[in-house]
Regions:
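Terminal helices and disordered tails flanking the catalytic cores of nucleotide-processing hydrolases
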Residues: 272, 277, 286, 296-465
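Sequence-structural signature of the catalytic-core scaffold of metal-dependent phosphohydrolases
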Residues: 1-91, 99-350
Length: 465
């Protein structure tokens, strides 16, 4: 049956959506994403990067459906179960970013304690920690008008709002996880990997989309080749009578394509996501957020879901323009701190400082002792956030300083496998890129106020002959 609505997208071409999906796409919670830029302040360096999380959400929904189609191509599923699982993963993909605050990750320091969101059993451990955008996503899905809309439009298709939340949650209540067991197979790990894993619809969309709108080639990779080689992998049950979990697999012929995809992500982080210009503004926003978090309550993000949905980029900048805070004035007037020093190093190199070169910490202290306004940051990370029982990889960090993104207990990501001659091998044992890029990369930067730049350069020359 032909889909009633087609959406034209510059990245994926025509996307087909059903009437029920259009109903939730048109709801307030999803439409709010039109007002939140995907890359936050990156358009200060890349003027074309003004695309929004709304277009990204549609793209992720489209790719999640294609991933599900690929892994089930040679599997038999009852048509009703096939439709239910496919619809569930598409909705989870559409909703995965609902909880983002203005400017995406940049304002998460203003979020309240998790307990104030009243997620109950969906909160997982550590209720005293600060909430994250993932927590807000669950709160919006489970306790806003969207929840009733999903029930109204999808109950007759066997899709419950809790099913969608179970895919998005690290620690869903066990009662809901059992709904994914069909003929002794547990589909939840595979569906969750389609939305959140090393090779997921989220990353596959944002690399291509961000690269396109930033006007750089670094995020391109062979999407079609990867999709064509996705495979389901059935693993032994965790207990004697338990279900057999299904995981996402990739045929070995696509391993080079996967390496290309990983390197695309790596290069996008260095060239776009960590570009020194928006990072300089992120540092000022971080200073503003810390002052607001400690004092005035005008810019605290509300725990109430309906009130939170009023916040987007325009609302945040409206508050900035009204603020007398010096950091807010700099942000509004685009008087960003400028890059003075940058150093990059990989652990395997272990290069000592060049002769006469001071550690970054000493540079900062010397500049401050001369009355120069300084902001510094140190980003450390690895190529991948991939987790398995044998080895772990931390994500390359986004340019938000320690403390801006709250600590969050995450469940281990289900293992991604490479399928070769009927055998399923954990990805890190097959893809050599993990071994070549396992070391941590450190990126250190020092920024100064533009009015202090000339004096700071002179002092730096005196420090490092």
């Amino acid at each position: 049956m032909r889909a009633p609505v087609r959406i034209r997208d510059p990245i994926h071409g025509t996307q087909r959506v059903t009437k029920s999906e259009i109903a939730v796409i048109d709801c307030r919670a999803v439409q709010r994403l039109r007002g939140i830029k995907q890359l936050g302040l990156a358009d200060l360096a890349y003027p074309g990067a003004t695309h929004t999380r709304y277009a990204h959400a549609l793209g992720v929904m489209h790719l999640a459906g294609r991933m599900f189609d690929a892994v089930t191509l040679d599997m038999w599923l009852d048509p009703a179960d096939h439709h239910r699982l496919r619809t569930t993963v598409r909705l989870a993909a559409l909703f995965h970013d609902l909880g983002h605050a203005p400017l995406s990750h940049s304002t998460e320091l203003l979020m309240p304690p998790l307990a104030e969101l009243k997620l109950g059993p969906w909160a997982g451990g550590h209720p005293g920690r600060r909430a994250t955008h993932e927590d807000y996503t669950l709160a919006i899905l489970l306790s806003s008008g969207l929840s009733e809309l999903v029930r109204e439009r999808f109950d007759d298709q066997g899709v419950a709002v809790e099913d969608v939340a179970s895919i998005l949650s690290d620690h869903p209540p066990s009662d809901f996880s059992r709904r994914f067991v069909i003929d002794g197979r547990d589909w939840r790990p595979l569906l969750r990997q389609c939305v959140s894993s090393e090779l997921d619809a989220d990353r596959m969309d944002y690399l291509l989309r961000d690269s396109y709108y930033a006007g750089v080639p670094y995020g391109r990779y062979d999407l079609e080749w990867l999709l064509e080689h996705l495979r389901p992998v059935e693993r032994p049950p965790a207990s004697e009578n338990g279900p057999r979990p299904l995981h996402l697999g990739l045929a070995s012929r696509a391993s080079f394509g996967f390496e290309d995809y990983l390197l695309s992500r790596y290069h996008m982080f260095l060239a776009v996501y960590l570009h020194h210009v928006p990072v300089g503004y992120e540092l000022m926003l971080d200073a503003l957020n810390r002052e607001e978090a400690e004092g005035a309550d005008a810019m605290k993000l509300p725990a109430d879901v309906d009130a939170y949905l009023e916040w987007d980029d325009l609302h945040f900048f409206y508050l900035l323009r009204r603020s007398s805070n010096p950091w807010a004035r700099r942000l509004v007037e685009r008087r960003g701190f400028r890059l003075l020093v940058e150093r990059t190093q990989q652990d395997s190199e272990q290069e000592p400082l060049r002769r006469g070169q001071l550690p970054i910490r000493e540079v900062v202290e010397r500049l401050r002792s001369e009355g120069i306004a300084v902001r510094a940051h140190d980003v450390k990370g690895k190529l991948s956030k991939y987790f398995s029982p044998e080895m772990s990889f931390d994500p390359i960090q986004t340019p938000h300083l320690p403390g801006l993104a709250p600590s969050r207990e995450e469940a281990p990501t289900p293992t991604l496998f490479v399928v070769e001659e009927g055998r399923a091998v954990p990805l890190e044992a097959h893809v050599a890129l993990y071994r070549r890029y396992r070391d941590e990369v450190s990126l250190e930067r020092v920024y100064v106020a533009p009015e202090d730049m000339d004096r700071a350069r002179m002092l730096l020359e005196q420090m490092e002959p």
